[in-house]
Regions:
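Short beta-strand->loop
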Residues: 107-116, 130-132, 160, 247-263, ...
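Ligand-binding pocket segment of bilobal, Venus flytrap-like solute-binding proteins
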Residues: 181, 187-260
Length: 351
């Protein structure tokens, strides 16, 4: 989907804003300074190449990226390698896994000078200096409007609806143990059903639920709305923003998000403890909060910028709302029970 408004926004922002923020270091030319910033991300990270090139030109640093996997894999790898860090800075730790990373002292404290006021609402409970919120979105079930119209079937609305016989063999989600959207969906079911969440998953399973490894598998392989993929599932786990990327020439979207099924996801970045280039890592964090990057996030990563002063693409206003009342689970409960919930899910749902 073309987003001309976003392109114009990015161009304007590039013309008038420093990409590395007010705290950017002098160009890294000294022999004693590292000249590479190693960035560790999840495998859905993407930004406009022109922005990355501009960061390198302005700071003198060379960016080097690695992506161990999805959000859950990213955090696991950061923990396993914390004594010999994979990089200098990491992006893509979400609120489901943040407590685990903080408990393992993976990150060093750093608060960007230009942290937007709106970011305060997404600070990690109890330790906002180690992780900086970068973007936010809602993980929700999505539906293929055309499929339901063709089959003369009402679209589901709630989590309960997904267990009804009318929707047997129609739903696909990603694995909570391997995928951050999958984990967000697990948390949504815990927030909605409390201690009955396992029974809910068992009803889903009995109704033909399909579980795959990653969000990419869900959306680009199994979802019927994916172009040319031959998917067979018209109900798929994705984001509330996904319908903004399936807009037709007449301005309508072929898909929709079920806003009563959503769990709020916040993605963070942080300077890795023991980083070889902490100054470069800090500069990259400042860069992620700069206006050009925040404006680029919607079109590249399906997420809302954490800076609420950034203008959104017009398509998002019409087709990509955040849920007015997302399902929630207290952060303290996630931190205390996440491993237990995942073990229970593995034992009683997957078997």
């Amino acid at each position: 989907v073309a987003l001309p408004a976003l392109a114009a926004l990015t161009g304007a922002a590039l013309a008038g804003c420093s990409l590395a923020g007010g705290g950017a270091p002098e160009p890294a030319g000294s022999v004693s300074q590292p000249t590479t910033v190693r960035v560790v991300t999840h495998d859905s990270f993407n930004l406009d190449e022109a922005l990355l090139d501009s960061f390198e030109a302005e700071t003198g640093y060379t960016l080097e990226f690695s992506a161990p996997g999805d959000g859950g894999t990213l955090v696991n790898q950061l923990i396993l390698t914390k004594d010999s860090p994979l990089g200098d800075v990491a992006f893509g730790i979400d609120n489901s896994f943040a407590g685990r990373a903080l408990a393992e002292d993976v990150f060093a404290d750093y608060t960007p000078a230009d942290l937007p006021a709106s970011a305060a609402a997404y600070a990690v409970d109890g330790d906002s200096a180690a992780l900086t919120p970068i973007d936010v979105g809602d993980v929700c079930m999505n539906v293929d409007h055309q499929w339901f119209a063709d089959h003369d079937l009402d679209e589901p609305v709630t989590l309960d609806d997904l267990t009804l016989p009318a929707y047997a063999d129609l739903t696909v989600v990603s694995n909570p143990a391997r995928s951050s959207p999958g984990l967000a969906f697990l948390l949504a079911t815990i927030g909605e059903y409390g201690d009955q969440w396992v029974a809910y998953w068992q009803r889903l399973d009995e109704n033909g639920l399909k579980i795959v490894d990653s969000w990419s598998d869900v959306y680009y392989t199994d979802f019927t709305a994916a172009e040319g993929a031959g998917g067979t599932r018209p109900i798929a786990l994705s984001y509330s923003t996904s319908p903004a990327f399936t807009i037709t020439d007449d301005g309508d979207s072929t898909t929709g998000a079920l806003l009563e099924t959503c769990f709020r996801q916040v993605e963070y970045a942080g300077v890795l403890a023991g980083a070889e280039n902490p100054a470069g890592a800090q500069a990259f964090l400042d860069f992620l909060l700069s206006a050009p990057v925040q404006a680029d996030i919607p079109g590249q990563m399906f997420m809302y910028p954490v800076d609420d002063t950034v203008r959104l693409p017009a398509d998002w206003v019409a087709h990509a709302p955040l849920a007015p009342n997302p399902i929630t689970v207290p952060q303290a409960d996630i931190d205390a029970h996440l491993d237990e919930w995942l073990r229970t899910w593995q034992e009683q749902v997957v078997g």
